[in-house]
């Protein structure tokens, strides 16, 4: 896979914003087939920063909307810690 295919989107919530401010950790959705080594190489190539990576698989959850029921899509999440003094510009106002 190419580096740009591995990283899908940032996960932006209140919890992830606190992680960015306090611990310099960024959270992203990544390809399900990607491993830690590939994710690390992708971030270092695209953003030109040194990182450490933790990954986890987020399981599908059961959801219901009226009479319709189903499951949300599962995905792989990567929490990327950037070395101190460096940043990743994931939003326009960074």
From Swiss-Prot:
Biological processes annotated in GO: translation
InterPro entries: Nucleotide-bd_a/b_plait_sf, Ribosomal_uL23-like, Ribosomal_uL23/eL15/eS24_sf
Pfam family, one: Ribosomal_L23
Signal peptide stretch: none
Entry GO terms, CC: ribonucleoprotein complex; ribosome
GO MF entries: rRNA binding; structural constituent of ribosome
Subunit structure of this chain's protein: Part of the 50S ribosomal subunit. Contacts protein L29, and trigger factor when it is bound to the ribosome.
Role played: One of the early assembly proteins it binds 23S rRNA. One of the proteins that surrounds the polypeptide exit tunnel on the outside of the ribosome. Forms the main docking site for trigger factor binding to the ribosome.
Protein's name in the database: Large ribosomal subunit protein uL23
Species this protein is from: Phytoplasma australiense
């Amino acid at each position: 896979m190419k580096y740009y295919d591995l990283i899908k989107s940032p996960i932006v919530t209140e919890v992830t914003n606190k992680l960015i401010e306090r611990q310099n950790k960024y959270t992203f959705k990544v390809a399900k087939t990607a491993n830690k080594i590939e994710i690390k190489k992708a971030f270092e190539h695209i953003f030109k920063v040194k990182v450490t990576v933790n990954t986890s698989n987020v399981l599908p959850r059961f959801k219901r909307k009226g009479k319709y029921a189903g499951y949300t899509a599962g995905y792989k999440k990567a929490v990327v810690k950037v070395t101190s003094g460096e940043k990743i510009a994931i939003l326009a106002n960074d």
